Regions:
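Helix-to-loop junction immediately C-terminal to a conserved catalytic motif
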Residues: 9
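Conserved ABC transporter NBD signature motif
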Residues: 17-24, 36-37
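Conserved ABC ATPase "signature" region
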Residues: 70-102, 132, 150-153
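Conserved ABC ATPase signature
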Residues: 106-110
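Conserved catalytic motifs of ABC-family nucleotide-binding domains
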Residues: 127
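A short, surface-exposed alpha-helical micro-motif characterized by mixed small hydrophobic
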Residues: 172-174
């Protein structure tokens, strides 16, 4: 499932196959170009930059910053307004994720749960149309899981598409509109929560019955929207 995300977002090169995002073929496209198109992701193992502050991590998430270009770097007047807008967006997102009081702390000092929140907030700096979340709830305590679920639901209400990988069927069934279940490297079911919950192959995969599909050992999981 992570390999699937890596291919979609340009972190791995495909051997074969084609796919499109918003009408544009993106297979093999560089990851930063895919992000600029509006498809962003988080990682199963968070990628926060520990020696930078939470705020600086957020600022790095904004695309197409004029001040990063050599031709503009010495002309601050050309990008000062954009810089202020980017910082304002970062402040708003940190407040939304209840992290504004941590803005100047080093990312390395954050707990695992706080890093998950930071990674999701940083991804939203790109104002994406589609966000891919790789096991966002894994290892989280109940309070963190509920917080993350609330953010996912808010994104959906705002018109942002969310595709996430998750193993917890209760979480998947409770929040998803459409589910794709993978086992042993292949799709075994696809449909609405009501449809998937009645699928015998899904029941076998998660309960470890005798259809030849092992119980969930990390090779079984679901991509949900």
């Amino acid at each position: 499932k992570t390999t699937f995300f890596n291919l979609l977002t340009g972190f791995d090169e495909p051997d074969t196959g084609k796919w499109q995002f918003d009408g544009t073929e993106v297979g093999g496209m560089a990851s930063h170009k895919i992000a600029q198109m509006g498809m962003v992701r988080t990682f199963q193992l968070t990628k926060s930059l520990g020696k930078m502050s939470v705020m600086d991590n957020m600022l790095l998430g904004a695309p197409n910053q004029k001040g990063e270009k050599l031709s503009f770097s010495l002309l601050r007047g050309a990008w000062r307004k954009q810089e202020a807008d980017v910082r304002e967006r970062a402040v708003e997102l940190l407040e939304r994720f209840n992290m504004s009081h941590m803005a100047e702390e080093y990312a390395a000092t954050l707990s695992g749960g706080q890093r998950k929140l930071l990674e999701m907030a940083r991804a939203l700096m790109a104002s994406p149309a589609l966000i891919l979340l790789d096991e966002p709830f894994a290892g989280g305590n109940p309070a963190l899981v509920q917080s993350l679920l609330g953010h996912v639901e808010a994104l959906r209400d705002e018109g942002v598409s969310v595709l996430f990988v998750e193993h917890d069927m209760d979480v998947i069934m409770g929040i998803s509109d459409w589910i794709v279940v993978l086992a042993e490297g292949g799709v075994i079911a696809e449909g609405t929560p009501a449809q998937v919950s009645k699928n015998k192959k899904v029941i076998d995969a998660y309960l470890g019955t005798d259809d030849g599909i092992a119980a969930d050992d990390g090779r079984t999981g679901a991509d949900a929207q």
